[in-house]
Amino acid sequence: MKIYLVGGAVRDALLGLPVKDRDWVVVGSTPQEMLDAGYHQVGRDFPVFLHPQTHEEYALARTERKSGSGYTGFTCYAAPDVTLEDDLKRRDLTINALAQDDNGEIIDPYNGLGDLQNRLLRHVSPAFGEDPLRVLRVARFAARYAHLVFRIADETLTLMREMTHAGELEHLTPERVWKETESALTTRNPQVFFQVLRDCGALRVLFPEIDALFGVPAPAKWHPEIDTGIHTLMTLSMAAMLSPQVDVRFATLCHDLGKGLTPPELWPRHHGHGPAGVKLVEQLCQRLRVPNEIRDLARLVAEFHDLIHTFPMLNPKTIVKLFDSIDAWRKPQRVEQLALTSEADVRGRTGFESADYPQGRWLREAWEVAQSVPTKAVVEAGFKGVEIREELTRRRIAAVASWKEQRCPKPE
C-alpha cells in the first residue's frame, strides 16, 4: 500500500497559495484493508474512505470508462493493480494530475509542473471530452487563477468548443451548472468565467440571456465600451472589487438583461430595460434553480438600478416608496446591496473605473434617516391599525425631505 497527496493540494502548494482541503490516493490496497486499518467508507460509486483521525478523504486508485451520457455516465474500476499514473490520467487538467509521496517528491507523469510554470490550463487526455462538467470547471479555474495570468491551452479550448457544439452540455443538471457558477462568482475575477464560456460557445447554451447582450449597442456618451455584453462583464469585474457577496455579484451580472429585448430599430437606446429585465432574471433563475434570496436581489437590481442613478431628481415620497419596494424595513442589507450594484454599473464602463458615485452615499444616508423614524412614537400618538403605517410613512417622507433639502444637491 502506497499513499499519495494528489490534486489541488499539490497544485496550490506549488503556486504558493493556501491549501484548504487535502485529498489522498491509495495505491495497491483493497476496501477490506482500508476498513481493517480503521478507515470509514463513505463512497457509494467508488471506494472513498475517511481517515479515522483527520477525516480527510482517501480514495483507492481507480480508472473511469465512459458508459453513458453526461457527467455521471462513467463506470469506475478500483483494484490493487491500478497504478498512480492510471489514476492521475483520468483527471481533467495536467496541473491537477500531480501527486506527492511521503518524502515530498512530486510525481508528474503529464507535465503538470511545466504547465504550472507556463501558466497553462491543459487537459490531460482526450477523455476530457467525455465529461461536459469539465467545460465549466476549466472556466472556473481560469477565473480562479486569472490574477496569476493563467490561460487555457489552444487545444483545450478547441476541445471545449467541440464538446459544446456536440450538445454535451445539455446533459448537465441545473444544480451542477449553478454550483459551478456560484463557485466562479466567489473568485477574484468572476467575469473570466463567463468570457471563457462565451469563447467556447457555452454561454449561448447555458446563459442565453447574457449571451444575447453581446453585440447590443448602448449610447457611446454613457457607454464608451458601447457593447452591452462587454459592459456586463466590466460591471461584474467591478462588483467583485466592491463586494465578496455572491448575491451582489450575480445581481450585477443580471442588471441589464432587459437590453437584450430591445428591438434593433430602437438601438442604442433602451427605455424601460430595467423592469423588462425582471422577467428574464426570473427565467434564468428558475432554469438554474438559483436560491430565492439571490434571485430576489437580482430582480430588484434589474428593476431599480437606473432609478438610483437619478437619485438627486427623486422626490422624498419616491425614495421612501423605493425602500418599501425592496422590503428594506425587514431586509435592511438590501439598501447596501443596491448601492453597491448601482456603483458597479456606473464604474463598469471604459474610463469610469475610478469614478465617484455619490448616489450610493445619498441612498445610504436617506435610508438611515428614514429608518430612524420611531414606530413607537406613532403608536403612542394614538394611531391605530392601518393608520399606523400611513402616519409612519408620512413621517418618513417628511424626515427624508428635510434631509434632502440639506444634504442632497438639487438637480439642475
Swiss-Prot record:
UniProt keyword Secreted present: no
Superkingdom, taxonomy of origin: Bacteria
Residues binding ATP: 8, 11, 91, 137, 140
UniProt EC number: 2.7.7.72, 3.1.3.-, 3.1.4.-
Positions that bind CTP: 8, 11, 91, 137, 140
Keyword entries, A-Z: ATP-binding, Hydrolase, Magnesium, Metal-binding, Multifunctional enzyme, Nickel, Nucleotide-binding, Nucleotidyltransferase, RNA repair, RNA-binding, Transferase, tRNA processing
Ligand binding (Mg(2+)): 21, 23
Family: Belongs to the tRNA nucleotidyltransferase/poly(A) polymerase family. Bacterial CCA-adding enzyme type 1 subfamily.
MF-aspect GO terms: ATP binding; CCA tRNA nucleotidyltransferase activity; cyclic-nucleotide phosphodiesterase activity; magnesium ion binding; phosphatase activity; tRNA binding
Name of the protein this chain belongs to: Multifunctional CCA protein
Described function: Catalyzes the addition and repair of the essential 3'-terminal CCA sequence in tRNAs without using a nucleic acid template. Adds these three nucleotides in the order of C, C, and A to the tRNA nucleotide-73, using CTP and ATP as substrates and producing inorganic pyrophosphate. tRNA 3'-terminal CCA addition is required both for tRNA processing and repair. Also involved in tRNA surveillance by mediating tandem CCA addition to generate a CCACCA at the 3' terminus of unstable tRNAs. While stable tRNAs receive only 3'-terminal CCA, unstable tRNAs are marked with CCACCA and rapidly degraded.
HAMAP family hit by this protein: CCA_bact_type1 (MF_01261), CCA_bact_type2 (MF_01262)
Quaternary structure, from the entry: Monomer. Can also form homodimers and oligomers.
Organism listed in the record: Shigella dysenteriae serotype 1 (strain Sd197)
The keyword ATP-binding appears for this protein: yes
The HD domain, residue ranges: 228-329
Catalytic activity: a tRNA precursor + 2 CTP + ATP = a tRNA with a 3' CCA end + 3 diphosphate; a tRNA with a 3' CCA end + 2 CTP + ATP = a tRNA with a 3' CCACCA end + 3 diphosphate
Miscellaneous comment as given in the Swiss-Prot or TrEMBL entry: A single active site specifically recognizes both ATP and CTP and is responsible for their addition.
A Pfam family assignment: PolyA_pol
Gene Ontology terms: biological process: RNA repair; tRNA 3'-terminal CCA addition
Cofactor or coenzyme needed: Mg(2+); Ni(2+)
Lineage of source species: Bacteria, Pseudomonadati, Pseudomonadota, Gammaproteobacteria, Enterobacterales
Cofactor note: Magnesium is required for nucleotidyltransferase activity. Nickel for phosphatase activity.
Database matches in Gene3D superfamilies: Beta Polymerase, domain 2, cca-adding enzyme, domain 2
